[in-house]
Amino acid sequence: MMLYLTHGNGEESMPLKLPASSSQVEEIDIRLDDICSGEGNFRISDVKSSVKGLWQFIRNADLLKPKELEKLNRLSRHINVMSEKERQIFTGALLSESVSSLDDVLRTVGRIRLYEIIPEVTCDRELGGYLVEHGRIDCPEHLKPYLDYVGINV
């Protein structure tokens, strides 16, 4: 995973490959302070990752805090060993969960095994039907015609 870091208005950015050390982050912070005009926080301006849309979930991480950097390093290590299918599942899980912090992202990556991709399901009604027909939700046969399949997956 590659982070692009900047200061201020983001006219210049520098890459940081994760996992990284705090000394690497501090060095980039100092270099950016010299080349970026204007005042502003040291921040993540972009993320290149095999997990689509990851930037929106980690952009507020404060890399100058060692605990935040360690969390990002852990996330990077998780992603580095994921298969393509696991990365797709992770992308979907991030979009379906209420993710508002780096801790939420790490919790989600830790629960990847609880998610699955069901290719034949494209809407709520199909998901409800899939869950009932495949025994994920126990329902007596005589009640199936009366089920609200759209509401089942909620």
How would you name each of these model-derived features?
Residues D46-R136:
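Long amphipathic alpha-helical segments
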Residues I28-R31, I35, H78, A93, ...:
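Residues that form generic nucleotide/phosphate-binding pockets
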Residues M1-G8:
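A short beta-strand micro-motif
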Residues M2, R113, K144-L147:
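Intrinsically disordered, low-complexity segments enriched in small/polar residues
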Residues G128-V154:
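Acidic, proline/glycine-rich low-complexity IDRs
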Residues G10-R74:
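N-terminal interaction modules that seed assembly of large macromolecular complexes
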